[in-house]
UniProtKB/Swiss-Prot annotation:
The gene is lacZ. The lineage of its organism: Bacteria, Pseudomonadati, Pseudomonadota, Gammaproteobacteria, Enterobacterales. Keywords: Glycosidase, Hydrolase, Magnesium, Metal-binding, Sodium. One of its GO terms (cellular component) is beta-galactosidase complex. The record marks H373, H407 as: Transition state stabilizer. This is Beta-galactosidase.
Length: 1060
């Protein structure tokens, strides 16, 4: 047969002829000549290699350097490029996004499409990447069988040529495109060419909240299959009601030439064998010929068979105990010789919704989930195994058991790793039309049905053999249309073993088995007109509603956020049908960029000149781009921990521990406990933890509380560690912790802050000598209080402590003064698009009220001589446009020990929105390498985000007191502090503090972390009260009322001392 007889006529079309059809603007054309979807194949030629998952010689990677040429539109590509490289071509790695290699620009938008909305049309100026590479095939490779090329991910559409002949076309950026290259190949050197379009009609279905980039960004490989080969394999497990036995059901289809399909003697000569292995032990085996199961009165499918193996006492798979078997499916010829084998990891597990509860192996599961985009700061959407594994290990270490593939099918290796390490997965179709108006515009349009359908059905066909996948998702934020209902029914018919979820149209349509709202709040209704978001507690109690509720997105972790997260987990544990959710989201989607000096920094929307853009809204992660943790990650870890604690009594000291594991014995846990006195251990111990799943046990720690030789507050700290390393954690990994303030201290602590009875001296005289060298000097401009080498100097004009001298050295660069504002958080700004400003956002309310432009006046200044101290009282008024807004009254007391105690009373006008903080700030001249404190720590914490913080004595380098959020904002607070030591400074009281080299003003005006410049000295913020950070979402005020400063008056007290 001649080459031309082998090749379909279409490949004879020229490049201009192919492009003139504009397939990328036709939603009913999603592919030409692409092979049907199936699970990943390796085509092993021996069973042992398949069973042990060895590299297959039948696969050949095409990753590496390709030749690349860039054009602004496809019509500009020279026709001869399909046969030979262009002179201007340069090497480009595959996989990669070309925008990260100097071509075109990445674009970050959330909702708004990056192109004019005119579906299915896209701009004529359509960036186009022309890839090519040569590869060599030995004659033996081509002697028999078929060769396929597999593209695991190309954005957004592409055409393929081999040796100058057109092979096919495909779109859908996140699923494999596989083509038969057999007719086009030759022994020796071969050339493939790929023309990739940035925009296609598929781009209207890929409007996810992410960087919009393009190119061949996943693996490319060749696969050699025999002429007769396995075409599809579907593996299901069915467990008995008592979970004591299971059936392994394998449905396999074989590719047989069509002329032989109706010949039972031919098809019956091929046999399928399934062998099930547990490690190196063969557990079960079954073999039978094709075409043995009658389908109807006309007989069986002659190219398929179904094998069912019974397994007694199977070891079950769960995220807690991800026990995997290995199923080897072999195709044999009539002589019982192996033609080829495929193999898959198998987990025996059951997913069901029963009595309103999502259950895994009969147990109601609490989803400790997170949304995850495929993102790497250097390589963008090209993710390697090291990065995938890093994410999984971090998730497991921080008590996550589930991940939602937001919002598209992930790299095939992701699912294998989730199978092996144990994470429940929501696999989501690559569909989002958030920028459409209405969102359901395309899902209700029959001409788009094929485009929608293939993205759902091909995902299921590729991924359905993975035990980690417990839920299918129809996509994200695409409204609710007839297409969704049809695809829901398709999944339920083709995979009845898993539920389906879909949030669009209000999270409770007939196209979802699970109520899966996003950003619904615990107790607060959001009654939007078309799709109301009820509080999660209310939602599960609505009439005729019996489905479980699992939030598909919640706790928007944008920047300094995540306030109120613990409230969700209180509700999850209280109401069984509230079964958890998926935090938004895992990683800050920032890309590494370089400034004019070649220095790298983390960039966000707009930094690449990209238009439109949504600025920093891409950075919502629990981890920074390099996977270092945000403080909020610890909050998630603590709230989601699998052990819960309660204090039963103090004499004897008894606690109760409850295991929330459903399947796992606590056979690698050690309980450690300590009784702490003001941060120091006075009694401690440890013992093994032996808890069965879902059980509780009491632990007697001590017969009584210890006798102390000094006063103070006692605390009981407990934590659980894993003595041995696990596949996902190192030895001594801390998995759970808790702390109690014990009911009563053994002594009543003395306080330097208690107001002693004041004995006023006779009339104050200038230059008066007080006891113990405490001196007072006054003139028309200043008031000075001196003690030994220290001098406190007040300005009569401002009423402020203008300077603190020590041995004639100034200690203050900026005076001590009130502080009522903070550098706005993303949650304070309250916007989801760069062009929309929410007038209800906190920052807008503060701006309108004049909080950032307050005019300060000293209303009064009085000096009093007491018997053992000097007292200075000052009143300050703050107004905006002549309207009084705030009034503060400071009382300074200087005592015979060289201490300055400040009592602050603040009164707030009823017309003023609640301030961000009630506190003070100053700029210290000193820079000390270390900060020590007694209070909540060690990481950053805020009034509504302190579940994971513990009271204790902490010490950190100064630079670690600043949290380097990429978009600068208020950060670094430590709450409930009683003592702060910084260099020679000591502060005592009950306060929150933040300390760094950056002022609030600089944080307010700087757009990126790398642009911050350390200032002279150290900025110290002391807060008596601080508003919460919020975090239910980031586009509406989300700080809970309990964490808002709503009172009219506030009072706090601080004692300062400098150790000379």
């Amino acid at each position: 047969m001649t080459s031309q007889e082998k090749v379909p006529l279409q490949v004879q079309l020229s490049l201009p002829q192919i492009l003139s059809r504009r397939d990328w603007e036709n939603p009913q054309i999603t592919q030409y000549h692409r092979l049907e979807a199936h699970p990943p194949f390796h085509s092993w030629r021996d069973v042992e290699s398949a069973q042990k998952d060895r590299p297959s010689p039948q696969q050949q990677t095409l990753n590496g350097l390709w030749s690349f040429s860039y054009f602004t539109q496809p019509e500009a590509v020279p026709e001869h490029w399909v046969r030979c490289d262009l002179a201007e071509a340069k090497p480009l790695p595959v996989p990669a996004n070309w925008q990260l290699h100097g071509y075109d620009a990445p674009i970050y938008t959330n909702i708004q499409y990056p192109i004019p909305v005119n579906p299915p049309r896209v701009p004529d100026l359509n960036p186009t990447g022309c890839y090519s590479r040569d590869f060599t095939l030995e004659p033996s490779w081509l002697a028999s069988g078929k060769t396929r090329i597999i593209f695991d991910g190309v954005s957004s559409a592409f055409y393929l040529w081999c040796n100058g002949q057109w092979v096919g076309y495909s779109q859908d950026s996140r699923l494999p495109a596989e083509f038969d290259l057999t007719p086009y190949l030759q022994a020796g050197s071969n050339r493939i060419a790929v023309l990739v379009l940035r925009w296609s009609d598929g781009s209207y279905l890929e409007d996810q909240d992410m960087w919009r980039m393009s190119g061949i960004f996943r693996d490319v490989k060749l696969l050699h299959k025999p002429e007769i080969h396995l075409r599809d394999i579907h593996i299901m497990t069915h467990l008995s009601p008592e979970f004591t036995s299971a059936n392994l059901e394998v449905m396999a289809a074989v590719n047989i030439p069509s002329l032989q399909l109706n010949d039972p003697q031919v098809t019956g000569s091929y046999q399928l064998r399934v062998q099930l292995w547990l490690a190196d032990k063969l557990v079960a085996s079954l073999q039978q010929p094709l075409g043995t199961q009658a389908i109807d009165e006309r007989g069986p499918y002659t190219d398929r068979t179904q094998l069912v193996l019974r397994i007694d006492q199977p070891l079950l798979w769960s995220a807690e105990q991800p026990t995997l078997y290995r199923a080897v499916v072999s195709l044999l010829n009539h002589q019982q010789e192996l033609i080829e084998a495929e193999a898959y990891d198998v987990g025996f597990r059951q997913v069901a919704i029963h009595q309103g509860l999502l259950k895994i192996n009969g147990k109601a599961v609490l989803i400790r989930g997170v949304n995850r985009h495929e993102h790497h700061p250097q390589t963008g959407q090209a993710i390697d195994e090291e990065s995938l594994l890093q994410d999984i290990l971090l998730m497991k270490q921080h008590n996550f058991n589930a991940v939602r593939c937001s919002h598209y099918p992930n790299h095939p290796l992701w699912y294998r790793l989730c199978d092996r390490y144990g994470l429940y997965v929501v696999d989501e179709a690559n569909i989002e039309t958030h920028g459409m108006q209405p969102m359901s515009r395309l899902s209700d349009d029959p001409s788009w049905f094929s485009a929608f359908s293939e993205r759902v059905t091909r995902m299921v066909q590729r991924d359905r053999n993975h035990p980690c996948i417990i839920i299918w998702s129809l996509g994200n934020e695409s409204g609710h249309g007839a297409t969704h209902d049809a695809l829901y029914r398709w999944i339920k018919t083709n995979d009845p073993t898993r539920p389906v979820q879909y949030e669009g149209g209000g999270a409770n349509t007939l196209a979802t088995d699970i109520l899966c709202p996003m950003y619904a709040r615990v107790d607060e209704d959001q009654p939007f007109p078309a799709v109301p978001k009820w509080s999660i507690k209310k939602w599960i109690g609505l009439p005729n509603e019996s489905r479980p509720l699992i939030l598909c997105e919640y706790a928007h972790a944008m920047g300094n956020s995540f306030g109120g997260f613990a409230r969700y987990w209180q509700a999850f544990r209280q109401y069984p049908r509230l079964q958890g959710g998926f935090i938004w989201d895992w990683v800050d989607q920032s890309l590494t960029h370089h400034n004019d000096h070649g220095q790298p920094y983390w960039a966000y929307g707009g930094d690449f000149g990209d238009t439109p853009n949504d600025r920093q809204f891409c950075m919502n992660g629990l981890v920074f781009p390099d996977r270092s943790p945000h403080p909020s990650l610890y909050e998630a870890q603590c709230a989601q921990q699998f052990f819960q604690f309660s204090l039963l009594s103090t004499t004897p000291l008894v606690i109760n521990i409850t295991s929330e594991y459903l399947f796992r014995e606590s056979d690698n846990e050690q309980l450690y406990w300590r009784i702490m006195l003001e941060g120091e251990s006075v009694l401690e111990g440890s013992q093994p933890l032996n808890l069965s799943p879902e059980s509780s046990q009491c632990y007697r720690l001590a017969e009584k509380l210890p006798t102390l030789n000094k006063p103070g507050q006692l605390w009981l700290n407990v934590e659980i560690r894993q003595p041995k390393e696990t596949p996902w954690s190192p030895a001594q990994h801390r998995s759970a912790w808790h702390q109690w303030r014990l009911p009563q201290p053994l002594f009543s602590p003395s306080s330097d802050l208690t107001n002693a009875t004041a004995h006023y001296a006779p009339q104050l005289q200038h230059n008066l000598q007080l006891q113990h060298d405490l001196q007072l000097q006054q003139d028309e401009q200043h008031i000075k209080v001196t003690y030994q080498q220290q001098c406190w100097q007040f300005s009569r004009q401002t009423g402020r402590l203008a300077q603190w001298w020590v041995a004639d050295k100034p200690m203050l660069l900026r005076p001590l003064q009130d502080q009522f504002v903070r550098a706005p958080l993303d949650n304070d700004i309250g916007i989801s698009e760069a062009t929309h400003i929410d007038p209800n956002a906190w920052v807008e309310r503060w701006k309108k009220a004049g909080m950032y432009q307050l005019q300060q006046r000293c209303l009064s200044l009085h000096v009093d001589h007491l018997s053992h101290s000097v007292q200075i009282s000052a009143e300050y008024g703050y107004e905006f446009e002549q309207e009084p807004l705030l009034h503060s009254h400071w009382v300074y007391r200087f005592d015979r020990h060289g201490r300055m105690t400040i009592d602050v009373n603040v009164r707030i006008a009823t017309s003023l929105p609640a301030p961000a903080r009630i506190g003070m700030c100053c700029q210290l001249a000193d820079i000390s390498p270390t900060v020590e404190w007694l209070g909540l720590g060690p990481h950053e914490n805020y009034p509504d985000r302190q579940l994971a913080a513990q009271y204790g004595h902490w010490s950190l380098p100064l630079e670690q007191m600043h949290t380097a959020y990429i978009f600068p904002s208020e950060n670094g607070l430590r709450c409930n502090t009683h003592t702060l030591n910084y260099g020679r400074w000591t502060l005592t009281g009950d306060f929150h503090f933040g300390i760094s080299r950056y002022s609030t003003q600089q944080l307010m005006v700087t757009s990126h972390q790398h642009l911050l410049e350390p200032e002279e000295g150290t900025w110290l913020n002391i807060d008596g009260f601080h508003m919460g950070v919020g975090g239910d979402d980031s586009w509406s005020p989300s700080v809970h009322i309990d964490d808002i400063l709503t009172r009219e008056t506030y009072q706090y007290q601080i004692c300062w001392q400098y150790k000379v």
